[in-house]
Amino acid sequence: MTWQVHLIEAAEKELALLPADLKARFLRVAELLEAFGPQKVGLPHVRPLASKLWEMRMSGKDGIARAVYVAAKGQRLVVLHVFVKKTQATPRRAIETALARLKELEL
C-alpha cells in the first residue's frame, strides 16, 4: 500500500493562496512522500518539527513556504497548515495552529 497525502479544508485554502512556484514545489514534495513514504524522504524536503508534527519545506523564486503535517492511520499524511515563512525559525504560532487543528481532527 502506498502513502497518501491529504489536506484538511483550511490547508487547501492556504495552499491556494501560495504563489504558483511554491504550489508546484508542494506538489513535488507530496509526490515524493506518496512514492517513497515519510521514512525515506528527508532533508531538504521534510524534517521533524514538534511532537507528532513534521514540515514539508518549499522554496522558490517567490519565497519560502512550509506545510505542517502529521502521519495518520492507514498510511496517510494529513496536511494541517500551509504558510509563507518570513523568519529563520518556524513561527510558534504556525505550530500552535497545526496542533489546534490536529486536536479538532482527533487523529
Name each model-derived stretch.
Residues L80:
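ATP-dependent carboxylate-activation loops
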Residues M1-I64, K73-R76, V84-L107:
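Basic, Lys/Arg-enriched alpha-helical interface segments
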Residues A67:
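Portal/gating segments that form or line small-molecule/metal binding sites
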Residues V70:
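Conserved Hanks-type protein kinase catalytic core
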